[in-house]
Amino acid sequence: MGKFSKIKKVQEEESAHQKMEWEAAGAKDSSSDDSSDESDNDDQPKQATEETRKRAELWTNRERVLVLCSRGADVRTRYLMKDIKDLLPHAKGDSKLDQQKSLNVLNEIAEMKNCTKVMYFESRKRKDTYLWMSNVEKGPSIKFLVHNVHTMKELKMSGNCLRASRPVLSFDDAFDKKPQLKLIKAVLMQTLGTPHHHPRSQPFVDHVFNFSVGEGDKIWFRNFQIVDESLQLQEVGPRFVLEMVRLFAGSFEGAVLYDNPNYVSPNVIRREHRKGQHSYIEKQLAVKASNIKQAKVTEILAEKTVDLVGKEFDTQNNAAADSEAAAQITAQIEKRRVRKKKSQASKYTGSD
């Protein structure tokens, strides 16, 4: 029994020694794998940091746009603001601004958000929408009245552009003819143009922002998709019209550089429309009264009246029948008028 116990003890020692060797070898392999993984992981952040550093060096235009609206904005204005945020990768949003606050508060909010430009949609009476575009640092700021708003969801056009892609800004030749339009063109380029090498932008161009000048210096905005290499255009949306109200030297303040003489307030237009409606209603009432009167006259004339006297006044039909009797009556009347002439004696002349 002693020999077997010794053999068993030796086998246990050998198995324990082999187990220790296997564990040591596994530890070496795991350490080598960990070191290789750590080296790979170290290389990845290094590459990422190098890419970000290169892109940061190329990203020289650090324009950021603050897009927000006032309280009481209607649904169409909110959807338009959402579409603009989707089209501008360098845009930042904020909560609605109370209308009781001064517009100068927007400059402080833009500085807190590290934004250099502001697009503020101001709604009045839940009917009229005004768009403010401002350069926070030095000005200027422009106030527009927004007409004919149609959002992407409403239009459902066939065109489609990728999100966060860079647009081509296309301007009408009329922007170079007037000084106020030149300034508006510069503000639109700085506000709506996506900076090159922006971190959130895609490195390609697939749509066009078109700005054209219409009657009364109204600016028409359209967004078109560039279809493949054929360079055909398909409208994407949104679409709206901007009518300039005033142009200020500062950011939401300062001297008035230009006041649009063709601008008419929506309140004045609604007042004139109401006046026109009142005059129109009066005209319609007068026409109705005259029509009723004419209908009564025609109805009276159409009725057949009965002559109660009989044939006495029917002179046309009874003239032939009563001609003899009438002749006798007239003869008697004329006889009475004829006087008998008395015979007069001849006067004495003295010749006898």
From Swiss-Prot:
Biased amino acid composition, Basic and acidic residues: 9-22, 43-55
Record Pfam families: Brix (PF04427)
Gene Ontology cellular-component terms listed: nucleolus
GO BP: ribosomal large subunit assembly; rRNA processing
One term of GO molecular function: rRNA binding
Keyword presence, Cytoplasm: no
Protein name, entry field: Ribosome biogenesis protein BRX1 homolog
Organism per entry: Caenorhabditis elegans
